[in-house]
Amino acid sequence: LFDNNSKLLSVSGMFAGQGEITGELPGELFRYNKGIENLSVFVGGCHGITSLGDGFLANNKAVTNVYYMFFGCSNMVGTIVPIWTNTYCPLITGTDVSKFQDCFKGCTKLTNYKAEIPTQWGGGYSPASGASEE
């Protein structure tokens, strides 16, 4: 989809709320967009998205904003790669929640929603207490 857009920097809100988008987002969706920075609300509210392909964002180290990226994608299942760690998105870790707030809010069918996804990222895990929040 974005193969011929090597200078792409932002897809903020591009497909937000589009019910027609269904299935898996390919793991290599942004493989040619190594400089992409802003994915805020990219597919937020797209209830038809069911999963992320292997390696999603693995080669996109310039990402600085995933605010509400998958907010409300309530049919996503499986285990999400830990984009909240330095390994995946080194420029958005830390305490500036405006860059990642509620990225996975409402994605409660994810296998690691309660066990790994931090509450500030929209998950149910509280790193401070080491416990999931109900």
Language-model regions: role of each:
Residues 1-134:
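Negatively charged
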